């Protein structure tokens, strides 16, 4: 039951709305609506009850009515006694009776009501019952909510606890309330005692629960995940959250979806941090040099896929040059990794290691190229410049076991003969370069030979170059020697077996008496001069430069092992010009 409303008459004769707080012997204590006046005691004769609900009569001219109005702006509206003077449609002209001077006002029907039929209150209009409260229930009775059911059962409009007298005060307008209150008092106090006992137990249990929760949740982690990564953090059907909750020592995981904030509670710090690794998804950018992007990705994306698989990141993307979201550094391409913080850290370690490896390899290759360039420069400065183009030189630098003229193998003849001192050392670090040690011509010498991908590979000669070079020499084997060799169909003959040249050139030529016919093709551009009583000596230095010297027959025995004694050979056809005295021919030019 709500508070009991009454109407209190003021000094001006108007009735103001108020509420009963307590009942005394000859007065009641009331509080006014909106607290426009302080709480005070009002005598019974100045108090009346409001009219019954639904009480309303037809209002006619000359009827006494009550008008809901106010005397000034400081006071609330109240009910004033008045009389209807005229009715025009919905408007009523009324005259106030409480005023000394006649005062008329035009009002509507909403502000009018019939005169309140209730008389002023008396001592018997209100009933008050006091019940002593046991000592153990005093604290319980101080709560108004504890008497809600009892108040409804006895029909009282107010049940309150008097802390000064330790009494339960019951107020009512019905006399039957006194009887019901006395009848239900023992039962009410017993139920209060039971409720109090249960409430104390629940309160103690709540305290223990709160204490346990605080103890269990003394470790707390809080972090925010980007809104576009919340789906990855939660996982399919909340799989990641369930996995984090299964971590031993984690007591609770809360998610604030509005702020995308995770709260993790646990018994120890390690459990909380481990659960965080399952839920904290982020995005990180790693800058990769543009010239290494292809090597980082690998063929068909094999290398970058290996990094993704081993690190555990969800995905990686390579930003386009025109992407405005990420401003790449100059000469760098951004690789964007998406995943947990732990997986991104692993991906960063793998990628940094691979980038350092690629940079070291490039540095080693650059150093090797610089060394090779210096070696080529040293080799070029240590030998005289050639008088003929490289294509006219007398040996192949690219294929040591190449064929002679007529595409036949050298078969250990001439310059292709390999002695016991021959050694070869090929470096495979770079296929463009090979280092070969040749036998003595006349002494051992090391050469750097550039591969087919280099510029020096243009120095290799073709079969036609061999053919032209043979025509530069005016020496040929004797007729007896030609019988020992296989005769070619084109009339060309292979040189003697004991010459130092690769094709039988440069052998010792004796002073033969009988001329022999020579049907070989001669090169009219270059002719070799010789004396009538001299011999030709061919020398090849370390730079592959050939020189022809004429010597007398007496000096032939001095050469020893260097020049072999040839058999009787038919003297070549005498040349038109005979040079008097020794003449030196270098590279076929006198």
Swiss-Prot record:
Biased composition (Gly residues): 497-509
GO MF assignments: chromatin binding; dynein complex binding; G-quadruplex RNA binding; histone H3 reader activity; microtubule binding; miRNA binding; molecular condensate scaffold activity; mRNA 3'-UTR binding
Region described as Disordered: 376-438, 453-590
Biased composition, class Basic and acidic residues, residue ranges: 427-437, 510-531, 561-578
InterPro entries: Agenet-like_dom, FMR1, FMR1-like_C_core, FMR1_C2, FMRP_KH0, KH_dom, KH_dom_type_1, KH_dom_type_1_sf
Segments of this protein annotated with the region RNA-binding RGG-box: 494-507
Keyword terms: Cell membrane, Cell projection, Centromere, Chromosome, Cytoplasm, Membrane, mRNA processing, mRNA splicing, mRNA transport, Neurogenesis, Nucleus, Postsynaptic cell membrane, Repeat, Repressor, Ribonucleoprotein, RNA-binding, Synapse, Synaptosome, Translation regulation, Transport
Every Agenet-like domain range: 4-50, 63-115
GO cellular component: axon; axon terminus; cell projection; chromocenter; chromosome; chromosome, centromeric region; cytoplasm; cytoplasmic ribonucleoprotein granule
Domain KH: 222-251, 285-314
Tissues/organs with expression: Expressed ubiquitously throughout the embryo. Shows tissue-specific expression in adults, being abundant in most neurons of the central nervous system (CNS) and in all spermatogenic cells of the testis.
Disulfide cysteine pairs (residue numbers): none
One of the protein's GO biological processes: negative regulation of cytoplasmic translation
Subcellular location: Nucleus; Nucleus, Nucleolus; Chromosome, Centromere; Chromosome
Gene3D superfamilies listed in its UniProt record: 2.30.30.140, K Homology domain, type 1 (3.30.1370.10)
Subunit details: Homodimer. Heterodimer.
Family the UniProt entry places it in: Belongs to the FMR1 family.
Function as written in the Swiss-Prot or TrEMBL entry: Multifunctional polyribosome-associated RNA-binding protein that plays a central role in neuronal development and synaptic plasticity through the regulation of alternative mRNA splicing, mRNA stability, mRNA dendritic transport and postsynaptic local protein synthesis of target mRNAs. Acts as an mRNA regulator by mediating formation of some phase-separated membraneless compartment: undergoes liquid-liquid phase separation upon binding to target mRNAs, leading to assemble mRNAs into cytoplasmic ribonucleoprotein granules that concentrate mRNAs with associated regulatory factors.
Free-text note regarding domains: The C-terminal disordered region undergoes liquid-liquid phase separation (LLPS) for the formation of a membraneless compartment that concentrates mRNAs with associated regulatory factors.
UniProt-recorded name of the protein: Fragile X messenger ribonucleoprotein 1 homolog
Organism (species): Xenopus tropicalis (Western clawed frog)
Gene field: fmr1
